Structures are given as C-alpha cells and as structure tokens.
C-alpha cells in the first residue's frame, strides 16, 4: 500500500512534532542530498594531497576500500536509527531518546559544529579550482585580482560562494530537491568522463605495481613513523570525503516515506560513493606518470602544490581543452556539494533550535511561508565563514594547514556525534524500538566496530599534521598548528561549563509541539 502524507505526519506526531516543513522530497531526492554532500568530485580532489603526502598510493589504493567499508558499517548503524526515529533532529534526537537530555545536548552541538565545518571546508576547498579556471580563461587574472595574493583571492572567492549558496537556499527552495537530483547524475557521468579521459588521453601511465605498493612521505615526519602515524593521517581523505550522509536524516521531515527513505539514503549514498570514489582515485594514480613532479616543492616545476591532484592531471593532459574539461566537471560538482551542505546544516540548526538548545533559538526555529528556515540558513553560513578566517594566514609548513584543520574539525565533530547514538543503541540492546528497516542481531558487532573506528580516527585527526605544528618542536609556528583539537575540545569544554552552570536547569531535550 502506498504511503501518504498523513502516514508521515502520523509518524512525526508520534515523535512529538507537527508538520512545519514542506514534505515534497522523494526517496531519490533524500538519497541525492547525502550523495551530493559526500561528493566524490569534491573530497577526492580537495583532500587528495593529504593522502598522497601522508602515505602515497598505498594510502589510496589500499586505504580507501578499508576505511570506506568501515564507514559503511557506521552508516548501516545510523540507517537503523533513522528508520526508528524519522525526524529532522536526526542524531541529536536519537541520542536524546536513547541516552537522555545531556547526551542529546552534547550530540546536537557536535553534529552542528561538524556540519558547519563541512560546509565551510567544501566552500573553501572549491576556491582553488575556481581560481585556476579563472586563470586559464582570463589572462592577467592571477596577478590583478586581490593584488595577485593567492590567499586573499581564495578567501574572497570563498565569501562569494557562501553568499551564492545562501541565496539559493533562501530563495530557491523549490529547486533544491531538483538540484540534488541533477547533482547525482552530474557526479555519476562527470566522474565517468574523468576516468575515461585519464585512461585514454595520457601517452604514459603508472604501473599497477606502483599504484598498490608505492609509499610516499612528504609530511616532514620520520619514515620510522610511516605505518603507525603518517599513513593513518592519509586516511583523512576517505574519512572526510565520505561524511555528511546524516543529511538524509535531517531531511526526514521533508521526505515522503521517511522511515524507509532516510535509512536507504544513508547507506546507499555511502556504498555508491565508496565504489565510485575508488574508481576515480585509481584513475588519478594510473595517470600519475610523473610522481617526482608531484612531489616537488619548486613552484617552477609544480605550480599547484606538493601532492596536488591537479598537478597529476596537468602533467597527464597538458593545460589544454581536456584539462579545462576535467576542472569544470569537478568545480561544478563541488558547488552542488556546498549548496547541499548548507541545506543539511540549516535543517539541523532548525531542529535543534526548535527544542531550545541554541542561543537565539526563538528566531532560529522560525520558518517562512514557504517552509524555509531563513534565519538558520543565514547563521549556518556566517558560522562557516567565521571558522575559516584562519585561512587568511599562510602556513609556514607549505600545506594549507587551516583548510585541513577545518576538515579535521568536520570529521572529528561529525563522527563523534555519530558515535554517541550508535553506542547508546548498542547499550539499549533488545529494548531498542526498532523501525521497519533494522539490522536484527547484527547490530551487536556492527555498532561495536563503528564505535572503535570512530574513537581511533578521532585520536589521529587531532594530532599535528606537520612537524612545525608540534608544540615545543624546533621551528614551531602557530600557522602550522592543527587547530582542530582547539576548536572541538574548546567547544566541548565551554559546553560542559555552560551545561553545569545553566543548561541543565532549563534544557529539557526534545519538546513536543503538538
């Protein structure tokens, strides 16, 4: 029997909420937003250098499938929760239901911090690609715009991108679902086109043996620490790329048949992105016929930065039409991604504010006549801009430390937010009110694996990513510091203080509004 809006509204009412957002999204659109936020055309390009410089081909050819499989386990655990509790509050609501008000409060804040960081990192990451494209199409651009200062150029482009994404979310509400649907096919056919170009266009290719065995350490850390420290830092490529899939849960109140569609949207977006991303990355490695140039820090030899995938593509294709073709495909894919990220972030902020958890919640929970949470969208965008300001200071380490710090914040905060309800579901055991889509008895080992993986990556990604970022080390420089632990840890400390001084006296968790 087909589900109706009344079925969805009844399920939402059972959770304590009336229908305020417009429920117009199909199951495919729900999947599409998570697939768009994961965006292999974004993460596989912008954080490729992290894996290349910290591990090399081994971190990609062997690391990607292993980490992607572990993330799929995490996603399956979350799908079960999404089916049981189909509300825009998502992770925060699950934690509140299973672990109480305090668990929900901290989970919600971690989730929000992570979503803001994801939005910011995608918005900032695409600026390098826009900069290069503008430089190839307009002579003199590189030296005239913002006085030729590359750092300022990227930040100005970042501001423009965030403004455009905000305007689309504010006034293009009827187009958002359609945009995400288009984004899916753009990612599928665009990635396929790039793979075909990199297979057939270059005159020479790397060997399969090199692709699966070559090790590279451009991190500055000792080779003795390769396996236990350097290589795991390279896994940030996978862990960052395949994230943001909680968007399917945050869009539950706008999705038809959300108790099944949100669950499927989460795990399918991970599965298909994992497969597609691996094929795309292997094409990059196959085309890497001049690794010495990619490893060079001499701008006369490598104009795109050490470990850059753009350098690989440029060496393989030259700077002509095919190079521009690939750059246009990835750039538009990343722009789709940042718009979807802002949508997801604003919905979570709306839901969290609806329960009174955020300062200014009375304004942030408001929706206009079109069912759009206007204030939540604007504040989400401004918060993303604020945490990216350190990118204006050039790192002495020679890598975009501020960018990778924002990436680390996104990964740590989001995955810790994922971990809390997964652990609480494991603890609940047979008392968990399973929905129609569930894991059965397999939840025991799946939830355990998910928790262990998240704890491990959270430890690694708060560590220094360059020797000059190690406090007390020779040549220490604050611009090389990974400020992910400062933001995440500092935020948690402030939240803990706020909780004990005030919040615990008035915050009641999810508030029924019917």
Please place each PLM-identified region on the residue numbering.
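Hydrophobic transmembrane alpha-helices that form the core helical bundles
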Residues: 46-53, 62-63, 72-162, 167-170, ...
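Transmembrane helix-boundary motif of multi-pass solute transporters/channels
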Residues: 14-128, 239, 245-248, 326, ...
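Membrane-interface loop-to-helix entry segments
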Residues: 153-212, 243, 266-271, 407-420, ...
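Terminal cytosolic tails of multi-pass membrane transporters
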Residues: 1-27, 422-446, 464-514
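TM-loop-TM module centered on a large, flexible mid-protein loop between adjacent transmembrane helices
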Residues: 93, 100, 132-143, 215-222, ...
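Hydrophobic, membrane-embedded alpha-helices of multi-pass small-molecule transporters
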Residues: 29-45, 76, 157-164, 217-287, ...
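Hydrophobic alpha-helical segments and their helix-loop junctions in multi-pass secondary transporters
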Residues: 128-135, 185-217, 239, 283-288, ...
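Selective recognition of specific alpha-helical transmembrane segments in multi-pass small-molecule
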Residues: 40, 66-73, 119, 187-202, ...
């Amino acid at each position: 029997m087909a589900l109706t809006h009344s079925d969805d509204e009844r399920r939402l009412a059972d959770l304590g909420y009336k229908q305020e957002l417009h429920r117009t999204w199909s199951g495919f659109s729900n999947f599409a937003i998570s697939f768009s936020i994961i965006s292999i055309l974004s993460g596989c390009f912008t954080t490729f250098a992290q894996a290349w410089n910290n591990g090399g081909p081994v971190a990609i050819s062997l690391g990607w499938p292993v980490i992607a499989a572990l993330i799929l386990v995490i996603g399956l655990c979350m799908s079960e929760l999404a089916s049981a509790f189909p509300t825009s509050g998502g992770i925060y609501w699950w934690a509140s239901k299973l672990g109480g008000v305090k668990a929900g409060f901290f989970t919600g804040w971690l989730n929000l911090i992570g979503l803001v960081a994801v939005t910011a990192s995608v918005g900032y990451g695409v600026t390098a690609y826009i900069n290069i494209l503008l430089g190839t199409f307009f002579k003199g651009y590189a030296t005239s715009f913002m006085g030729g200062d590359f750092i300022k150029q990227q930040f100005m482009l970042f501001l423009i991108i965030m403004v455009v994404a905000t305007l689309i979310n504010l006034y293009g509400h009827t187009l958002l679902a359609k945009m995400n649907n288009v984004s899916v096919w753009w990612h599928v056919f665009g990635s396929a086109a790039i793979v075909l170009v990199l297979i057939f266009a270059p005159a020479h290719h790397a060997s399969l043996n090199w692709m699966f065995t070559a090790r590279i350490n451009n991190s500055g850390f000792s080779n003795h620490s390769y396996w236990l420290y350097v290589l795991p830092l390279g896994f940030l490529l996978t862990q960052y790329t395949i994230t943001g899939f909680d968007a399917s849960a945050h869009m539950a109140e706008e999705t038809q048949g959300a108790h099944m569609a949100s669950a499927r949207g989460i795990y399918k977006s991970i599965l298909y992105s994992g497969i597609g991303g691996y094929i795309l990355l292997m094409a990059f490695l196959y085309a890497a016929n001049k690794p010495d140039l990619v490893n060079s820090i001499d701008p006369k030899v490598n104009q795109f930065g050490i470990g850059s995938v753009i350098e690989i593509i440029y060496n393989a294709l030259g700077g002509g039409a095919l190079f521009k073709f690939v750059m246009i495909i990835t750039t538009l894919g990343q722009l789709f991604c940042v718009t979807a990220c802002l949508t997801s972030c604003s919905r979570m902020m709306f839901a969290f504010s609806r329960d009174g958890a955020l300062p200014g919640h009375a304004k942030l929970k408001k929706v206009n006549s079109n069912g759009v949470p206007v204030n939540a969208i604007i504040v989400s965008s401004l918060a993303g801009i604020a945490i990216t300001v350190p990118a204006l200071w050039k790192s002495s380490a020679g890598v975009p430390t501020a960018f990778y710090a924002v990436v680390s914040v996104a990964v740590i905060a989001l995955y810790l937010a994922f971990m809390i309800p997964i652990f609480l579901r494991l603890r609940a055991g047979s008392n968990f009110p399973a929905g129609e889509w569930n894991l059965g008895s397999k939840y025991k080992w799946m939830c355990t694996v998910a928790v262990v993986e998240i704890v491990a990556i959270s430890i690694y990604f708060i560590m220094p990513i360059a020797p000059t970022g190690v406090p007390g080390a020779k040549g220490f420089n604050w611009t090389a510091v990974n400020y992910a632990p400062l933001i995440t840890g500092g935020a948690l400390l402030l939240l803990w203080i706020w909780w004990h001084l005030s919040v615990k006296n008035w915050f009641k968790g999810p508030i029924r509004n019917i």
